[in-house]
Amino acid sequence: MAAARFRGLAVAGGGESSESEDDGWEIGYLDRAAQKLKEPLPIEEKNETFKRALTAGDVALVEELLDSGISVDSSFRYGWTPLMYAASVSNVDLVRVLLDRGAKASFDKDKQTILITACSARGSEEQILKCVELLLSRNADPNVACRRLMTPIMYAARDGHPQVVALLVAHGAEVNTQDENGYTALTWAARQGHKNVVLKLLELGANKMLQTKDGKTPSEIAKRNKHLEIFNFLSLTLNPLEGKLQQLTKEETICKLLTTKSDKEKDHIFSSYTAFGDLEIFLHGLGLEHMTDLLKERDITLRHLLTMRKDEFTKNGITNKDQQKILAALKELEVEEIKFGELPEMAKLEISGDEFLNFLLKLNKQCGHLITAVQNIINELPVNSHKIVLEWASPRNFTSVCEELVGKVEDLSEEVCKLKDLIQKLQNERENDPAHIPLMEEVSTWNSRILKRTAITVCGFGFLLFICKLTFQRQ
């Protein structure tokens, strides 16, 4: 029978697994001599040979069998077509031949489309990408979902293929579609720990706040599955990548995709993306990405930027429009700056009590803000170094600055104690000075007491006169 014809060449099985061990795609042997059909085969045997040729990836024999009359849309066991099988093993040459012979790219079996099969295929991303591109070029719909409401982009995200994800979106795939459990493509990527896919989806406009049916966001899903780097990145308030490619046209996105380097040429951390520092995140959050190179050329840090004055902004080439955005962001931080240079000089003794009290109140409020800021940093700072997502300088630099900060806080404490002692001394001397002029509050209180005593005395004297007069009249 047919099995006797196949000897000598090992072939691998493929396709989706099923409950039955016999899925219609047997592992067998294909004799090279049988690759050329010397005589017509019975229909049943021809179909078996066709399956074996597909399994072996023998494009020439597949074409010969198609020429002999086998339908390109033949239905094998479980309803799979030749194109569906070729897509499941990422055989680009077979996919191209079958499509050129009229195979339907939009075919589905029980809502399992050929495009979904290609996106969840076994093989390298490069091969999968080529197969998906071929299917999309033949009008395969990227938004048709399977029975679990999973779309091709979800399968690509789940299996860790960022370039396939980008290609699907470029051809109209909805990036924020949810499956029967409320999972989006971003949720699947976060669940499986695919950092490159997470970043690509954020570029393409994925909504990181969409929740699953049990109320979990992608960041929470990542945390639950112990992907802490992804959890930390998704938990950032400002997202420097969000929607970066969303506004590009289909042609622009494809062009950008094709000019992207392969994964082998990318850095280990977060694919080809540069790790973002605090300055970059701040600028991206305000839509001021164009200022990044300018500030880096001038070695301006975020701390320096946030303490700049009007003349410094202008001097460093920052336009008025950009200045307004930065100043508005500073205002939202609700950090009140004390302008010590505008206070009267203490040495001139011209400062009023109200001004001095206002100065002390502002100083106290500012210290409160600083304490709160440091407490927030302590609470948010990752405990372990491997959890840090953003690009950091050497820890020694941070330690050195903290040591200087501690020294300045100690100096401030010492100076405030001196100020307190001086104020107490002045107060004691004033109270003991005979020439001391009472405050208005003190004078007012004394006058009030005198008036009360005078009024009581007059009333008492008047009452005494009334009693005396009444006594004389009776006598």
From Swiss-Prot:
The modification Phosphoserine is found at S17, S18, S20. Keywords: ANK repeat, Cytoplasm, Developmental protein, Differentiation, Meiosis, Phosphoprotein, Repeat, RNA-mediated gene silencing, Spermatogenesis. Signal peptide: none annotated. Residues 272-334 form the SAM domain. ANK repeats lie at residues 45-74, 78-107, 110-144, 148-177, 181-210, 214-243. Its main location: cytoplasm. InterPro entries: Ankyrin_rpt, Ankyrin_rpt-contain_sf, Asz1_SAM, SAM, SAM/pointed_sf. It comes from the Eukaryota. This is Ankyrin repeat, SAM and basic leucine zipper domain-containing protein 1. It comes from Equus caballus (Horse). The lineage of its organism: Eukaryota, Metazoa, Chordata, Craniata, Vertebrata. The gene is ASZ1.
